[in-house]
Amino acid sequence: MKLNERSLAFYATCDAPVDNAGFLYKRGGRGTGSHRRWFVLRGNILFYFEAEGSREPLGVILLEGCTVELVDAREEFAFAVRFAGGRSRPYVLAADSQAALEGWVKALSRASFHYLRLVVRELEQQLAAMREGSPANALPANPSPVLTQRPKENGWVVWSTLPEQPSVAPQRPPPLPPRRRASAANGPLASFAQLHARYGLEVQALRDQWRGGQAGLASLEVPWHPGSAETQTQDQPALRGHSGCKVLHVFRSVEWPVCNPGSQGT
């Protein structure tokens, strides 16, 4: 069998999940001692590296047409991978513990396609027995999801694998609340001219009220003429404040007092 070395090296160190990985002791050929190697199982291929972080594998074992069995060896927790045919030498491996031994034997025994074919055959027999035993609940010969074509959405046809549900009449939405209408006692809606005249009267009344207030403030004004304070007091009586100051002129809300020093005591 011809294999691409680059493809195997990439497959051995890629980021895909592995079926099993760990350190095993591998016995060399011609009765040499064992070496501790890092083994990685991916599918039906067993890679072994010099160390855990090595970038290239030292070797590869294709797990097809082989059996995994326990052996008596110098190493504890030893097992062997044997191939059919007298020319193929077995691979004797040893784990660090009993749990690791059981895990490796189970994983290697289930790695070949031969094991998968046996599993598929067993499942087919169980399925046939279930169909014969319960005809009422028999499964269809070729179960396939029902594809229901749906209308196009955004130019693409949407397919659904779910079974069709019984059609149910859609529930009507709750009725909308009635609109507010003008009562019959109020008569027809007023026109724009009527509204303009009605609110115009109110605006005019407010303007007249404001003008009346302005006229009342203007009556409190005292005209001021240039001259001395004595001349001003002779023409008109002066208004006195709480401190005896004479008020010469009143500007609606602002007063300009001139205090008489002689009137502080009065």
Swiss-Prot record:
It is found in: Early endosome; Recycling endosome; Golgi apparatus, trans-Golgi network; Cytoplasmic vesicle, Clathrin-coated vesicle. Keywords: Cytoplasmic vesicle, Endosome, Golgi apparatus, Phosphoprotein. It comes from Mus musculus. Residues 17-113 form the PH domain. SUPFAM superfamilies: PH domain-like. The F&H motif, an approximately 12-13 amino-acid sequence centered around Phe and His residues, is essential for binding to OCRL and INPP5B. PROSITE patterns: PH_DOMAIN. This is Sesquipedalian-1. InterPro entries: Boi1/Boi2-like, PH-like_dom_sf, PH_domain. One of its GO terms (biological process) is receptor recycling. One of its GO terms (molecular function) is protein homodimerization activity. Residues 165-184 are annotated as: Disordered. The modification Phosphoserine is found at residue 183. Was named after 'sesquipedalian', an unnecessarily long description of a simple thing. The gene is Pheta1. Plays a role in endocytic trafficking. Required for receptor recycling from endosomes, both to the trans-Golgi network and the plasma membrane. A motif (F&H) lies at residues 191-203. It comes from the Eukaryota. Pfam families: PH (PF00169). One of its GO terms (cellular component) is trans-Golgi network. Forms homodimers and heterodimers with PHETA2. Interacts with OCRL and INPP5B. Interaction with OCRL may be important for endosomal morphology and function. Belongs to the sesquipedalian family.
